[in-house]
């Protein structure tokens, strides 16, 4: 049995809770802020110690490149253990006009070259998040959400959906007679959508997250 110091156990438990809550491991800055470290460098030291003990794996160059190891009931996380040799070129989608496809050319502001190790599976585009409705899932205003195009999603997955003229990011929960779009922030209301509603269309699922300034 691997023995961790009290501080290392705190860091490990924080990583696990973050992955259970959102699917994303925390950044060094988030670990430092949560546990009261003086800087992200202090968090990095503890992460390296955990990696040496074989309980996590770190992906070089990825701010969220942390993977839990050797745990039978480890939560599913939206990251990969190793960087691939090739880079992905992903379009960044800004504001989406009503009634037009998300990937319409006029919505694409630029392209990013991304390390595939940042994502659980290959995304099709990055969507700039607006608002704080998913704050408690670690998704903040201005973040770039990596999205894989899908027309179906599993219960509990974080999705991108078109709702009337708007595009929204929420957690999907299936309910009798429809689905509920769950906000991860008590300041925002959940949205119930009746089965077969013409106002609702699933656009994709979240497969990763990039925070500007950490990219």
Swiss-Prot record:
<keyword id="KW-0805">Transcription regulation</keyword>
<keyword id="KW-0804">Transcription</keyword>
<dbReference type="GO" id="GO:0006508">
    <property type="term" value="P:proteolysis"/>
</dbReference>
<comment type="similarity">
    <text>Belongs to the peptidase S24 family.</text>
</comment>
<dbReference type="InterPro" id="IPR050077">
    <property type="entry name" value="LexA_repressor"/>
</dbReference>
<dbReference type="InterPro" id="IPR006199">
    <property type="entry name" value="LexA_DNA-bd_dom"/>
</dbReference>
<feature type="active site" description="For autocatalytic cleavage activity">
    <location>
        <position position="170"/>
    </location>
</feature>
<keyword id="KW-0234">DNA repair</keyword>
<dbReference type="InterPro" id="IPR039418">
    <property type="entry name" value="LexA-like"/>
</dbReference>
<keyword id="KW-0238">DNA-binding</keyword>
<dbReference type="InterPro" id="IPR015927">
    <property type="entry name" value="Peptidase_S24_S26A/B/C"/>
</dbReference>
<dbReference type="Pfam" id="PF00717">
    <property type="entry name" value="Peptidase_S24"/>
</dbReference>
<dbReference type="InterPro" id="IPR006200">
    <property type="entry name" value="LexA"/>
</dbReference>
<dbReference type="GO" id="GO:0004252">
    <property type="term" value="F:serine-type endopeptidase activity"/>
</dbReference>
<dbReference type="GO" id="GO:0009432">
    <property type="term" value="P:SOS response"/>
</dbReference>
<keyword id="KW-0235">DNA replication</keyword>
<dbReference type="InterPro" id="IPR036286">
    <property type="entry name" value="LexA/Signal_pep-like_sf"/>
</dbReference>
<dbReference type="InterPro" id="IPR036390">
    <property type="entry name" value="WH_DNA-bd_sf"/>
</dbReference>
<dbReference type="InterPro" id="IPR006197">
    <property type="entry name" value="Peptidase_S24_LexA"/>
</dbReference>
<dbReference type="GO" id="GO:0003677">
    <property type="term" value="F:DNA binding"/>
</dbReference>
<dbReference type="GO" id="GO:0045892">
    <property type="term" value="P:negative regulation of DNA-templated transcription"/>
</dbReference>
<keyword id="KW-0068">Autocatalytic cleavage</keyword>
<comment type="subunit">
    <text>Homodimer.</text>
</comment>
<feature type="site" description="Cleavage; by autolysis">
    <location>
        <begin position="98"/>
        <end position="99"/>
    </location>
</feature>
<comment type="function">
    <text>Represses a number of genes involved in the response to DNA damage (SOS response), including recA and lexA. In the presence of single-stranded DNA, RecA interacts with LexA causing an autocatalytic cleavage which disrupts the DNA-binding part of LexA, leading to derepression of the SOS regulon and eventually DNA repair.</text>
</comment>
<dbReference type="InterPro" id="IPR036388">
    <property type="entry name" value="WH-like_DNA-bd_sf"/>
</dbReference>
<keyword id="KW-0378">Hydrolase</keyword>
<keyword id="KW-0678">Repressor</keyword>
<keyword id="KW-0227">DNA damage</keyword>
<feature type="active site" description="For autocatalytic cleavage activity">
    <location>
        <position position="133"/>
    </location>
</feature>
<dbReference type="GO" id="GO:0006260">
    <property type="term" value="P:DNA replication"/>
</dbReference>
<keyword id="KW-0742">SOS response</keyword>
<protein>
    <recommendedName>
        <fullName>LexA repressor</fullName>
        <ecNumber>3.4.21.88</ecNumber>
    </recommendedName>
</protein>
<feature type="DNA-binding region" description="H-T-H motif">
    <location>
        <begin position="28"/>
        <end position="48"/>
    </location>
</feature>
<dbReference type="GO" id="GO:0006281">
    <property type="term" value="P:DNA repair"/>
</dbReference>
<dbReference type="Pfam" id="PF01726">
    <property type="entry name" value="LexA_DNA_bind"/>
</dbReference>
């Amino acid at each position: 049995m691997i023995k961790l110091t009290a501080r290392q156990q705190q860091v490990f438990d924080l990583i696990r809770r973050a992955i259970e809550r959102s699917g994303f491991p925390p950044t060094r800055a988030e670990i430092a802020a949560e546990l009261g470290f003086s800087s992200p460098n202090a968090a990095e030291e503890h992460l390296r110690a955990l990696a040496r003990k074989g309980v996590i794996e770190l992906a070089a160059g990825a701010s969220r490149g942390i993977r839990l190891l050797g745990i039978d009931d480890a939560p599913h996380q939206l990251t990969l253990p190793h960087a691939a040799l090739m880079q992905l070129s992903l379009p960044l989608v800004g504001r989406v006009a009503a009634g037009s496809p998300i990937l319409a050319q006029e919505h694409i502001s630029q392209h990013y070259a991304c390390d595939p190790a940042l994502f659980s599976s290959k995304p099709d585009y990055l969507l700039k998040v607006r608002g704080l409705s998913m704050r408690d899932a670690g998704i903040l205003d201005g973040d770039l959400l990596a999205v894989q195009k899908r027309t179906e999603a599993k219960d509990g997955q974080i999705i991108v959906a078109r709702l009337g003229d708007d595009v929204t990011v929420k957690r999907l929960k299936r309910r009798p007679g429809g689905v509920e779009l769950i906000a991860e922030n008590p300041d925002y209301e959940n949205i119930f959508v009746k089965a077969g509603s013409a106002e609702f269309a699933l656009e994709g699922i979240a497969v990763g997250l990039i925070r500007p300034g950490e990219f």
